[in-house]
């Protein structure tokens, strides 16, 4: 795994004293209390839903479906940045039931790590398109191949407000992602080892 979700941070500040001593202050996304609660919830969900005879793909699908079926997209945070939920972290979907793309991605990454499956977060920031916000999703190594896994887009907000589950972005290749998104979203152009 490339970067563990719990190592994510929002701010880094360095201070140099008169004696040239450097102090670094890091604002992490997760507190120790949140990490403990998240780990307990991951263990609980895993034990209730995953069996030893499942294939890796079945395990991923089970967790994918569990997270989506128990999470609502946090429209408030996406619209104006204000929300009472920790939806941008794994805490949101796992303990509060709300997520933005970062929350879905971090939650899924924690389960993939528990399964021993290599993964990393793919971040897309459009260069010239002001109509699209940045987006993140998981890249997953399965059977020596890399696939895209996007729980956010598999948990769409329907116009009638109803929740539903889809698998359109479940373990798809880069070529499949390009075809689905009509080349609008930058995707992985090289192979990862």
Model-predicted regions and their roles:
Residues 83, 87-91, 98, 119-131:
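Catalytic cysteine-centered active-site loop
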